[in-house]
């Protein structure tokens, strides 16, 4: 596994930060926010792309691609995957980005207005388009199998891993390098999400991203990438790979309701969760833990709560539910992948992190949202992602037993 996040630029740093309850929120440094209501973001700190590629390659990639190549490199090294010993056409890539490069668009649009269309850079399109994350990862590491770029807004990372899982199930790959990446903390990115009233305008880093809290007022935009190496079980055993957990279920649905709001009754998200459990052959009452989408917006946290109650009935009150976004913010297309890595570590270590900043909930939000952390066996973990456009995806993980 590999991770570039607002609280650490490796899985180890990220996970240590999670256990410490560390938050990655601070004033936006990429541009002057004097005219913006939103002042905070969860930026990646101290990232040096030349640790993962040469300077020429770094110059020919936008930051969302640099993050992806870095996280993928960490994951491939962690997996001990030696491409010279693999059939490269059976090793694929499914790394998605919800937006691509807003930086490239802003930069070249300014050039267009100032100097005319003849001065727009020839690299604009290949720098900008979101599929270049998967393209650059494949090029960097020689992955010649199926290469996908899933774009489902905030569900991108989860769908990317899910589609990689299906690819292996169908026999189209032995190994898939999968995850999500995003870097959209830019003037137009912040202005656009602010106009939707999706972002928190709090200037207090401790009270900005507070999923399920009654005072929540929007999400904090984050950035980064997480990538995992998914592998067919027998293939992994044959080469003596480290196996952290098993991915056993993938469920999807569409709300077909609204371009930004989840379905109010939670039916779409509930269907995705139940589909993942059915796919994995796990009865709902066997599940003890859900990593929620938990964005800290009024609608998401309320409607996701309704979805969990709809899917699990009274058993919903026995589940432990947390939100990793309480520490790293909303990484958009990378969010689901970062939360997948979180679930793997929680299963591996028998630890469920707390939802940082959660103080008091409103009447309908009456489930266990993990005000405190728990040290206990985690046999299964379900992780949810709900994207603009009504895209719902859930992944079911299982503790690996040799």
Predicted regions and their residues:
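Flexible, low-complexity linker/loop segments at domain and module junctions
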Residues: 85-88, 280-286, 317, 365-402
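Condensing-enzyme catalytic core mediating Claisen C-C bond formation in acyl metabolism
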Residues: 22-26, 204-280, 289, 402
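Active-site-proximal alpha-helical scaffold in enzymes
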Residues: 68-81, 130-134, 138-182, 220-241, ...
